[in-house]
A protein has these predicted regions:
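Hydrophobic alpha-helical membrane segments
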Residues: 1-280
Length: 280
């Protein structure tokens, strides 16, 4: 695979294509997201190990959405083909994907431990205090505003952002390029750095859309009441998250070229996909 450079404006194109590909098969993507949500709920029943397993599966979840988007962009059904294609990748790729998941778990725990050391345990103490039956909303709001808690939140968000750079393209590189899990982390980091302009625009557009969605939810809750509008807000949030995952494929396909016609199918025209065509 060859690393490519894209213009910063391509970030907005990735978002648009996420909406386009979702619009072609909304039920397929919705069923995929529902399957992932159901799996995480099942794993959540298992104490400790369930949370670790859910975290370890994060790279695979992003990959299966990439597979689904590529399939839809090339005129195929998202489900159940995406799941079948994932498990049909071969033993070496699946093992590499599993290693990615385990590294992701280890790195997350390490970074969160470091954040806990740097904030003096303030955030952990805050969450422990939430279990206190005597805690009032006013006292909780006061504690959230404490510098240590704010630092803890900021550090964890920062560390997760840095971690996502290495893992953003890694699952797709393992699946379509097979460079091994360690090299995939390196190439993912290089790809995002080389195309930092496009990824910055991409992130800002998603942030702006999320703020608009929050404003809609806030206004709707004020007009119709939180309980009633929750019936609308929940599906809106789920669609937002699903479209975000659907757009991930295009961030990968534009950053890497391949001699494999299937791997090179980027859905340049979502309505009439050409497998040999690159995005622009």
């Amino acid at each position: 695979m060859k690393l490519l450079h894209v213009a910063p404006s391509q970030g907005t194109v990735w978002v648009r294509k996420g909406f386009q590909v979702f619009g072609r098969q909304p039920l397929g993507f919705a069923s995929l997201f529902a399957a992932g949500l159901f799996m995480s709920l099942l794993l959540g029943i298992i104490p400790v190990l369930g949370s670790i397993a859910t975290l370890a599966l994060a790279p695979a979840v992003s990959l299966v959405f990439m597979i689904a988007s590529r399939r839809v962009a090339t005129g195929q059904a998202a489900m159940p083909g995406a799941i079948v294609e994932l498990f049909g990748a071969g033993r070496s790729r699946l093992v590499a994907l599993l290693k990615l998941g385990l590294v992701y778990v280890a790195a997350t725990f390490l970074l969160f431990w470091l954040a806990g050391v740097l904030d003096g345990g303030a955030l952990a103490s805050f969450f422990a205090g939430l279990r206190d039956s005597k805690l009032t909303p006013e006292s909780a709001a006061t504690r959230v505003a404490e510098p240590g808690v704010q630092l803890g939140l900021l550090l964890r968000l920062l560390f997760l952002g840095v971690l996502s750079i290495a893992f953003w393209q890694a699952p797709a590189l393992v699946f379509w390029g097979d460079p091994g899990w360690a090299k995939s982390l390196f190439f993912s980091t290089v790809a995002l750095w080389r195309n930092k302009g496009a990824f910055t625009i991409y992130s800002l557009v998603w942030l702006a859309l999320f703020m608009v969605l929050l404003a809609i939810v806030s206004i709707g809750a004020g007009l119709f009441g939180p309980e009633r509008f929750a019936l609308v807000a929940a599906p809106l949030m789920l669609v937002f998250m699903t479209v975000f995952y659907a757009s991930l494929w295009f961030t990968f396909a534009d950053c890497f070229s391949s001699s494999d016609p299937v791997a090179a199918s980027r859905g340049d025209d979502v309505d009439h996909p050409d497998p040999m065509k690159g995005t622009s």
